[in-house]
Amino acid sequence: ITMKKILFIGLSIAAMISCSRAKETIEYGDYQDNTSENPTKMAKVIYGEDHSMISNPERGFCTRNGYHSRSSVISDYEINTLKSSKHTLVFFDFKLKEFISSPINSDMLGMMQRNFDKLRANGIKAVVRFTYSSSTSAAVYDAEPSIVLKHISQLKPILEKNKDVIALIEAGFIGAYGEWYYSTHYGNKGQADYAKRRTIINAMLDAFPKERMIAVRTPLIKTNLLNISLNSPLTQSEAFNRSNKARLGHHNDCFLADEKDRGTYTGEQDKKYTQLDSKYTVVGGETCTPPTSYSQCNAALQTMGKYHWSYLNLSYHQDMIADWKNTHCFEEIQKRLGYRFVMKEVQYTEKMESGKNYK
């Protein structure tokens, strides 16, 4: 069996195989079967690629849902909308503002579990983030390290229990929106306190499921956390070994805004690093501006390919999403986000006899 794997973004474990019966052809010929005495006639089936939208898990568009302790679970309407749109992901932003100086209460933890149960019952997975503030004008952006560490320990069992419906975890916790920029306790850009930040990310890597990656906001955050240079992207031999380097991925929440995506990148070196590193990590995020020259269809598709994008938040920025729909680019992006497995051909023994081994 011969297959090709078309990767537009990052990685996922499972896939649905898509074949087009319309282009199916059968060829016959004599192929040497090394497991039997004589050459055996083999048949070969060649398939054409199905270019339709495939609802593969852990990839594609997602919508953002914010929850606090008094929230109800994701509604049946939202679930049905996801399914009818062939979306397999939802973004859960668990808001911890009311626990910024105290442990997470049982109501909040119970609400999280009910949401994960609802996803499991409907074959959907979540991108998960935990935040303390949802505005750059918030009086306090994040909790003190001792509180965050307590929260991480509280979250450990629930995330482990539900790792089957969690696609990835965004680093969160620090800064406005959990994006590690405007921060109360961990330093701001240019004065970031990486000793404290490493304490938090190391606790997350230790406590959260080893099978899941944690996405950070910029490439320099990853390299600074790991004390490595931009000349050290993941290699094939390092990929998926569950080391901290292999488990840290990327989320860009100002995608296609301008040349540097509003500070996501500082220059060409960290762009190149991310293009190489992202071959083996999860990558996703959201847009943050109205349409730009960088978001025009061909440019957007090319950039998503270079950075191996897996998922994109549909909730923001609405003007850019609308522009993709108006220019007939939306469906193409939806199809290409993530991965596709395509069966190209199958060879099999045309006739078999009892007692012999065949391919």
Residue ranges and their predicted role:
Residues 1-30:
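Bacterial Sec-dependent N-terminal signal peptides
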Residues 31-89, 93-95:
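Boundary/entry segment of secreted carbohydrate-active catalytic domains
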Residues 75-133, 145-148, 208, 212:
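Aromatic-lined substrate-binding rim segments of carbohydrate-active enzymes
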Residues 108-125, 142-168, 193-207:
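An active-site-proximal structural segment forming one wall of the substrate-binding cleft
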Residues 127-137, 155-191:
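Active-site groove signature of glycoside hydrolases
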Residues 168-170, 179, 183-319:
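Catalytic-core regions of glycoside hydrolase
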Residues 296-351:
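Catalytic cores of secreted or luminal carbohydrate-active enzymes
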Residues 356-358:
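Structural beta-strand segments of beta-rich domains
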